[in-house]
């Protein structure tokens, strides 16, 4: 048997790849290039030899800091390009590699240029917005001034009091300079202040002015025609132009302070109509000049950003690679001469030749006089777990890894989950109409695979795309199980001709309840469509699906136990085979394996025996005659033997192994044997990284702890055999729920609406049926069946053999950054 097993071909996914711990001694002059080439290869996971040092104490901390600063500048350029509405269009030609120092200088120059252009543009934009506000104030305030001019004193009162609240506004406006330096002002005459304020502040602003002047003011306001950009916040807001008439220097001071507090911008407006028109022309002229200047600045800035955008993608990749290289170099140690860097890491055994060739090429390309020393080390801790997967198996491997990463070289459940997972899903989801809908969705994802793989997807879409092959297999198995159940959106199809049953005579009026006879062989595949609508439909389908669920569950749990045997055999643990695998197989199959056998015999013979009665009285009255419940000769003695075996298996699981471990431990430390004790149950307090091959410690053997752990493990298996078998009945329950929901939506929505002659009611019925099918049956039910299949694999199947305390192989690879 062992020779036969040894001759079987190796499976890539059955066990993780064999790993090797290697040491690298790299000369300083070729260190950077060597790490770069290893990152391109992506098959070496470095160990951090400076874990006790902070990031700032490491050798290449300054280089990492420089890379971080360059990353910040590149993010700044990316944000500026996005804000400008430009696209990063990388050059088609291959750019030569650029040194880190040269790239750093280029980025600094570009950043300085862009920041300077942004600053100038911001100042010009602020001036433009202020002039725009000034223009609006001139247009709106002139009406108030004309109406008030007839009541004003003959002496012209210019608005030198109307101080402009924004510092240094319009320093060169010739007419404005004249207006700000009037001849003389009557200190007791009527004055005014004009400006503009946000509309949402207007009521509070007016109330504050009224209280500050004790009502001795006249407030006029009008809304601007459109939203304008606020000069201080650069936000589009709705503003209101106001003119405040007052008297006295003290009132002027109070009003200006209130304007400043509320963020109102005050602008000087002359009373004379001619001067207003002249000032308006000057403002419009300056606005036109500023628009031309802003457009030219925007074009110049966009040209500069476009020149950056051509190389931005390559620069981002270069900086990321350089930072990853220096982060990896920080994990290496200098030797005593400070001329070489020493590193350690894990690599797959098959990759040693490739790594050696890469290091030789790095030595040659860097013109180093000394080559890189590459040699294998003796591993103490457990290696990382690495599986070589493809697009199809990767999704199933991720499902398993979500529960726990496999211990180094233990049996991998993902191999079997590729088939069992979609099949158990389909048992719960079996409807070939719904399966076709899932298939169309999976085919759409596969057809757009190349395009979607290069796009940035949302979290939900990314999850769907990553599981596209899982969805494909679930759809195919759902179609298969739906054909077995003979359900197409809950409707049975006569795929293989008519039913095997027909009416006894021509007077048979109800072919679903009475008068049916079987006139030919059973339906060749799937459920006979005549069961649909009959009085015995639910009892028949429930019996079929319940028994099928038990058979599938016992088969999968037995597969899990068989894998535990292969694990124990691979790790050389004969104790686990003799005192764990054998009694567990006996216990499970003496009870539930026997139940599965009875189900198959009953199906084959057509017996009317009550299996509930058989199993219950197998425990309560094992010696009583079975009577009409006897399925085969010798059933009662066989049941007694199986019951005794089940009772014997429990202490077999519990007692021998702890005592055998204590005996081996005592012999080992008495000098009679020096072999390393290898067992999955020896060192209960050992961390996962020392689970295999790390046995040079001399800890005190704690027999009580070993015994308690074995007791818990035995009780858990005994109780779990019952609960896990019952858990597989969810296959029956969810299949029944899915079928009944489909029937309700079909009969109570679609057929009911179709019974009306009104076309509107029919359309509503079709819409409701389509909505219920899509969102309840194809989304909620799919998710429910998916999660239940997940539970059956994680707990019922993997719990029989899977440790899941390993850690992933994470190589240094540029493809992963």
Swiss-Prot record:
The protein's location, in the record's own words, is: Vacuole membrane; Golgi apparatus, trans-Golgi network membrane
Chain ranges on the Vacuolar side, renumbered to this chain: 444-468, 569-580, 661-758
Name the GO cellular-component terms.
endosome; Golgi apparatus; trans-Golgi network; trans-Golgi network membrane; trans-Golgi network transport vesicle membrane; vacuolar proton-transporting V-type ATPase, V0 domain; vacuole
Positions the record marks as coiled coil are 97-133
MF terms from GO for this chain are:
proton-transporting ATPase activity, rotational mechanism
> What topology in the membrane does the UniProt record assign?
Multi-pass membrane protein
Question: What keywords appear on the UniProt entry?
Answer: Coiled coil, Golgi apparatus, Hydrogen ion transport, Ion transport, Membrane, Transmembrane, Transmembrane helix, Transport, Vacuole
Main localization of the protein? membrane
Residue intervals on the Cytoplasmic side? 1-422, 490-547, 602-639, 780-817
Instruction: State the function annotated in the UniProt record.
Output: Essential component of the vacuolar proton pump (V-ATPase), a multimeric enzyme that catalyzes the translocation of protons across the membranes. Required for assembly and activity of the V-ATPase. Required during cell expansion.
Q: What is this protein called?
A: V-type proton ATPase subunit a1
What is the species of this protein? Answer: Arabidopsis thaliana
Q: What is the lineage of its organism?
A: Eukaryota, Viridiplantae, Streptophyta, Embryophyta, Tracheophyta
Gene name in the database record: VHA-a1
């Amino acid at each position: 048997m062992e020779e036969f097993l040894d001759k079987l071909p190796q499976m890539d996914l059955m066990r993780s790849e064999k790993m090797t711990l290697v040491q690298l001694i790299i000369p300083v002059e070729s260190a950077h290039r060597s790490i770069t080439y290893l990152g391109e290869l992506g098959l070496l996971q470095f160990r951090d030899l400076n874990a006790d040092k902070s990031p700032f104490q490491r050798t290449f901390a300054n280089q990492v800091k420089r890379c971080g600063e360059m990353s910040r500048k590149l993010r700044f350029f990316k944000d500026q390009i996005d804000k400008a509405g430009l696209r990063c269009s990388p050059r088609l030609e291959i750019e030569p590699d650029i040194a880190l120092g040269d790239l750093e200088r280029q980025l600094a120059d570009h950043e300085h240029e862009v920041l300077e252009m942004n600053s100038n543009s911001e100042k010009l934009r602020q001036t433009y917005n202020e002039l725009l506000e000034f223009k609006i104030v001139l247009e709106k305030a002139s009406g108030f001034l004309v109406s008030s001019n007839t009541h004003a004193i003959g002496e012209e009162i210019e608005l030198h009091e109307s101080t402009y609240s924004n510092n240094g506004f319009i320093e060169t406006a010739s007419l404005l300079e004249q207006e700000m330096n009037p001849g003389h002002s009557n200190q007791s005459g009527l004055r005014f202040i004009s400006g503009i304020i946000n509309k949402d502040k207007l009521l509070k602003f007016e109330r504050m002015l009224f209280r500050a002047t004790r009502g001795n003011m006249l407030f006029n306001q009008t809304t601007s025609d459109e939203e304008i950009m606020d000069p201080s916040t650069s936000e589009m807001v709705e503003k209101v132009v106001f003119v405040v008439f007052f008297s006295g220097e003290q009132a002027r001071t109070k009003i200006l302070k209130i304007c400043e507090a509320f963020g109102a911008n005050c602008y000087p407006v002359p009373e004379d109509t001619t001067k207003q028109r002249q000032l308006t022309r000057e403002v419009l002229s300056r606005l036109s000049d500023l628009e031309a200047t802003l457009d030219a600045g925007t074009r110049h800035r966009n040209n500069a950003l476009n020149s950056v955008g051509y190389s931005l993608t390559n620069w981002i990749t270069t900086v990321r690679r350089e930072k990853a290289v220096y982060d990896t170099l920080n994990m290496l140690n200098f030797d005593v001469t400070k001329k070489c860097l020493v590193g350690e890491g894990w690599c797959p055994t098959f990759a040693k030749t490739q790594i050696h060739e890469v290091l030789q090429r790095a030595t040659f390309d860097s013109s180093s006089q000394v080559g890189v020393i590459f040699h294998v080390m003796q591993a103490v801790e457990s290696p990382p777990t690495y599986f070589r997967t493809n697009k199809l198996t990767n999704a199933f491997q991720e499902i398993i890894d979500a529960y726990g990463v496999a211990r180094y070289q233990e049996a991998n459940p993902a191999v079997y989950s590729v088939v069992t997972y979609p099949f158990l899903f389909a048992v719960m989801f079996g409807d070939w109409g719904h399966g076709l809908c899932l298939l169309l969705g999976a085919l759409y994802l596969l057809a757009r695979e190349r395009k979607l793989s290069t796009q940035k997807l949302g979290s939900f879409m990314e999850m769907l795309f990553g599981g596209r092959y899982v969805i494909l297999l679930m759809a195919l198995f759902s179609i298969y199980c739906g054909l077995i159940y003979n359900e197409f959106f809950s409707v049975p199809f006569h795929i293989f001709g008519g039913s095997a049953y027909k009416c006894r005579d021509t007077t048979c009026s109800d072919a679903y309840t009475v008068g049916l006879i079987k006139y030919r062989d059973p339906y060749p595949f799937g459920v006979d469509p005549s069961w649909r609508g009959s009085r015995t439909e639910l009892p028949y389908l429930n019996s079929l699906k319940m028994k099928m669920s038990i058979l599938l569950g016992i088969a999968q749990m037995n597969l899990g136990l068989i894998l535990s045997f292969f694990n124990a055999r691979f790790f050389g643990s004969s104790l686990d085979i003799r005192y764990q695998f054998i009694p567990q197989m006996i216990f499970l199959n003496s009870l539930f394996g026997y139940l599965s056998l009875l189900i198959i015999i009953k199906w084959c013979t057509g017996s009317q025996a009550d299996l509930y009665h058989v199993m219950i009285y197998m425990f309560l009255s094992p010696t009583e005659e079975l009577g009409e419940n006897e399925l085969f000769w010798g059933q009662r003695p066989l049941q007694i033997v199986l019951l005794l075996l089940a009772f014997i298996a429990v202490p077999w699981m519990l007692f021998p192994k702890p005592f055998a471990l204590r005996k081996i431990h005592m012999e080992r430390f008495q000098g009679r044997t020096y072999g390393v004790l290898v067992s999955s149950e020896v060192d209960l307090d050992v961390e996962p990284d020392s689970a295999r091959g790390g046995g040079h410690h001399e800890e005190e053997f704690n027999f009580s702890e070993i015994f308690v752990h074995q007791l818990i493990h035995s009780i858990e298996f005994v109780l779990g055999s019952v609960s896990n078998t019952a858990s597989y009945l969810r296959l029956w329950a969810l299949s029944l729920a899915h079928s009944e929901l489909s029937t309700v939506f079909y009969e109570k929505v679609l057929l009911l609406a179709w019974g009306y002659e009104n076309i509107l009611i029919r359309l509503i019925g079709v819409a409701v049926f389509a909505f219920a099918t899509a969102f309840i049956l194809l989304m909620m039910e799919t998710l429910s069946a998916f999660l239940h299949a997940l539970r059956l694999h994680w707990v019922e199947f993997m719990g029989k053999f899977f440790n899941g305390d390993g850690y992933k192989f994470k190589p240094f690879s540029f493809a992963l950054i």
